[in-house]
């Protein structure tokens, strides 16, 4: 009788879960990485308010509450363990230290990022208030500062992913990301997301 009872006891998964964060500068490939992880079977924290468009054919995968991190909006973290959420690099420093994070940090040539941002603004009939040279310097300083900060956070593991290499070699990077996360993911579906035809605004063209 007791053996039967114990044999049917539920198995409790005691594996510690991390909050998975996709980060980087805007237009660095964060939405594509979110799409990859979603296709790979990782639960995504998103509100789907902002739909896919010409600027982001893969969708935006945004979650409005994270935009209030600097204001102390942290309630969403209670439901974030084991899920992936997109957070721009400027907000990473506001993540509380009582959680553990796996950060996938997207890197892309700054000239490509600026060119992509300019095209997005142009489609919306808007103009940047800052010239590219100034913006590039600001981005470079920000990236140096955030990398310095990340390297000193005991509760954060980080992998840096180069956008252009991911586009041209998605299989290799999908495996690396899966190993970094340490959770079951469908690598084949992940690697099917990057599309070189969507690799616009290359560094050689963004002069």
Predicted regions and their residues:
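Conserved phosphate-donor/acceptor-positioning beta-strand/loop module used by diverse small-molecule
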Residues: 99-118
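The conserved 3'-phosphoadenosine-5'-phosphosulfate
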Residues: 49-57, 151-207
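Short catalytic/ligand-binding loop motif for oxyanion handling, primarily in non-cytosolic enzymes
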Residues: 29-34, 92-95, 111-116, 167-171
């Amino acid at each position: 009788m007791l053996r039967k009872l114990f044999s049917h006891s539920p198995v409790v998964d005691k594996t510690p879960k991390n909050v998975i964060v996709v980060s980087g500068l805007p237009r660095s490939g964060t939405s594509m990485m979110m799409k990859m992880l979603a296709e790979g079977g990782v639960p995504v924290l998103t509100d789907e308010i902002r739909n896919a468009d010409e600027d982001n054919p893969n969708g935006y995968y945004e979650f409005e509450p994270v935009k209030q991190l600097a204001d102390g909006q942290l309630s969403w973290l209670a439901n974030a363990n084991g899920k992936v959420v997109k957070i721009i690099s400027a907000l990473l420093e506001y993540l509380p230290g009582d959680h553990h994070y796996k950060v996938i940090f997207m890197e892309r040539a700054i000239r490509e990022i600026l060119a992509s941002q300019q095209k997005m603004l142009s489609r919306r009939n808007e103009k940047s208030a800052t010239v590219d040279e100034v913006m590039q310097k600001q981005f470079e300083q920000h990236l140096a500062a955030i990398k310095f900060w990340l390297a000193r956070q005991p509760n954060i593991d980080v992998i840096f992913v180069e956008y252009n290499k991911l586009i041209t070699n998605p299989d290799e990077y999908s495996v690396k990301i899966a190993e970094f996360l340490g959770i079951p993911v469908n690598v084949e579906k992940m690697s099917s997301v990057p599309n070189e035809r969507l690799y616009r605004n290359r560094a050689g063209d963004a002069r």
